[in-house]
Amino acid sequence: MTDQSSPQVSEETQSNWAREQFQRANLHLAENGILFDSVVTEECRYLAPLVAVWKIKTTDGKYFWVISGDVPADFTHHENAKDARELLNYFALRWQMKAANLRASAVNDLTQIEYAAYLENRSEGLFRIKDKEELWA
């Protein structure tokens, strides 16, 4: 995926969106006890305003992939995906499994059922982005 967005998104809007998503990704890591040191910029990708993928080096020298955007902020160890495109597939599958588990355990909990539907919707979106060859050329 190249660092592009749809034509109607201005460069300034795209830049602001990417900065906001980077901050959101860092906040998510910090809330999970992971402290950011640097970014592996050549492996990061974003498609404003849909999804941003960041490869982060932590203060203790570990690497993580982080996803943000119009999706749940989430992260995983860098070993789980070789690149940003594979990472979209990883999170799409992970969120589908999480949604299935939520549906199975939250029979009468409308909030959990709605969140499961949200995860399913976002995972389908990630699959579509991953499959668009023109984004990855």
Model-identified regions with their sequence ranges:
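Negatively charged, low-complexity tracts enriched in Asp/Glu with abundant Ser/Thr
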Residues: 2-46, 134-137
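Amphipathic protein-protein interaction modules
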Residues: 77-118
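Charged, low-complexity surface segments at secondary-structure and domain boundaries
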Residues: 1-13, 103-114
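Contiguous interface-forming segments/domains that mediate binding rather than catalysis
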Residues: 4-7, 23-26, 58, 77-81, ...
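Short aromatic-glycine-(Arg/Gly/Cys) micro-motifs in beta-strand/loop hairpins
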Residues: 42-76
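A cross-kingdom feature marking charged/low-complexity
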Residues: 42-56, 108-137
